[in-house]
């Protein structure tokens, strides 16, 4: 695509009057990826500023540079105000606006995004769709998976992925949309058909600073959804009637609304919920019909996830029989209330719970399965929201019999300092503090017996531990299996 043609998609940029009008062969934000003909977009990040690498990009063959200020480079430089947003728009245009050729479903919220997105994908596959998935665990194009670096990739990677999906015949893409991605403009230019909200509880306050700012970031998914009446296919906002933030999201969107819930009246509801150690049965009540469904998942949070997925499917006009069939065929997601079975006579559960709300929910669910003592191994991430540390500790102490505090990706922080922050919330309480995560897991499993439950919280599907700028292999489920086998 010619540079002048590409720049027409940036409506707030002065018309490009350079003598050169090169063919753009790729769009890059990392100077190391630049090749002959690339358009290099300078992005100022947390630790690195792309403007400092403009000359390097030009020397590697960049045809032009988009920047927020003057840079030292012997190629055309286009100055604009917001390069992050520009990167999203330019990437969308360069790859042929692929989301306009997909049914795009975005799911945002503090907890439940990963499980819900997998449920949605399963229902749509049952309906005959060829699906794509973008999320915390991986990116998936039909049956092929790729490692994910962020919950929501950078905009240029995102649009490139959508292009691959379209080229490989995908018709429906489901993606987790993080508050960071919304605030940074990574999804600017994505043409969503359905946007869904799971819940809003404390997380990422190291980045957003206040819950109001966090809520506003989430609301951007709904405010940019567009008007329902300007499209052949209506746009839908799917909202949790039991979460107070939904009222705000309903105000900022002009899309059609579809609600779900358990406590408050909603379009899609779960009634007569019955939980057992290995599954949950409830009545699914929707505008398309009602049916009793059984899922091999436990916990009220999983019922909410199913309701979100069902509401999304209804918004997409999937037949009710297909929705219930998809729900009945659901499987657990790795690291989400994952049962570890190595022949022991007590449940060991690995879960991604890393926020106060998610930890409380999963501990309450575990309590329902516990006849004896409830053990929880829990830590808090380094270089992240410090205010949730004492709250997480208090929840662990209040809801578990044997809380074990430990390290969970301390990153650049001293793990002992993180444990001290946690302990500030539980002075005088009973708990164990074992900084080495492997030793903490071994301790909990060594002391558990029949009738007890061991919950290992925080890392879920992650297979690494980040300590002091280094990344080490670490898998909670694998460590738990090893502990069970060695301690038999």
Swiss-Prot record:
Described purpose of this protein according to its UniProt entry: Catalyzes the addition of meso-diaminopimelic acid to the nucleotide precursor UDP-N-acetylmuramoyl-L-alanyl-D-glutamate (UMAG) in the biosynthesis of bacterial cell-wall peptidoglycan.
Binding site for UDP-N-acetyl-alpha-D-muramoyl-L-alanyl-D-glutamate: 31, 150-152, 178, 186
GO biological process, one term: cell division
Motif Meso-diaminopimelate recognition motif in this chain: 408-411
Taxonomy of the source species: Bacteria, Bacillati, Bacillota, Bacilli, Bacillales
Gene: murE
Signal peptide segment: none
Cofactor: Mg(2+)
Pfam entry (one): Mur_ligase
InterPro entries for the chain: Mur-like_cat_sf (IPR036565), Mur_ligase_C (IPR004101), Mur_ligase_C_dom_sf (IPR036615), Mur_ligase_cen (IPR013221), Mur_ligase_N (IPR000713), MurE/MurF_N (IPR035911), UDP-N-AcMur-Glu-dNH2Pim_ligase (IPR005761)
Binding-site positions, meso-2,6-diaminopimelate: 384, 408-411, 458, 462
Stored HAMAP family: MurE (MF_00208)
PTM description: Carboxylation is probably crucial for Mg(2+) binding and, consequently, for the gamma-phosphate positioning of ATP.
Main location: cytoplasm
PANTHER family associated with the record: MUR LIGASE FAMILY MEMBER, UDP-N-ACETYLMURAMOYL-L-ALANYL-D-GLUTAMATE--2,6-DIAMINOPIMELATE LIGASE MURE HOMOLOG, CHLOROPLASTIC
Residues noted as binding ATP in the record, renumbered to the chain: 109-115
Compartments where located: Cytoplasm
Record-level GO cellular component terms: cytoplasm
Protein family membership: Belongs to the MurCDEF family. MurE subfamily.
Organism, scientific name: Bacillus licheniformis (strain ATCC 14580 / DSM 13 / JCM 2505 / CCUG 7422 / NBRC 12200 / NCIMB 9375 / NCTC 10341 / NRRL NRS-1264 / Gibson 46)
Catalytic activity annotation: UDP-N-acetyl-alpha-D-muramoyl-L-alanyl-D-glutamate + meso-2,6-diaminopimelate + ATP = UDP-N-acetyl-alpha-D-muramoyl-L-alanyl-gamma-D-glutamyl-meso-2,6-diaminopimelate + ADP + phosphate + H(+)
Pathways per UniProt: Cell wall biogenesis; peptidoglycan biosynthesis
Positions of post-translational N6-carboxylysine modification: 218
Name of the protein in its database record: UDP-N-acetylmuramoyl-L-alanyl-D-glutamate--2,6-diaminopimelate ligase
Enzyme Commission identifier(s): 6.3.2.13
Keywords assigned by UniProt, alphabetized: ATP-binding, Cell cycle, Cell division, Cell shape, Cell wall biogenesis/degradation, Cytoplasm, Ligase, Magnesium, Nucleotide-binding, Peptidoglycan synthesis
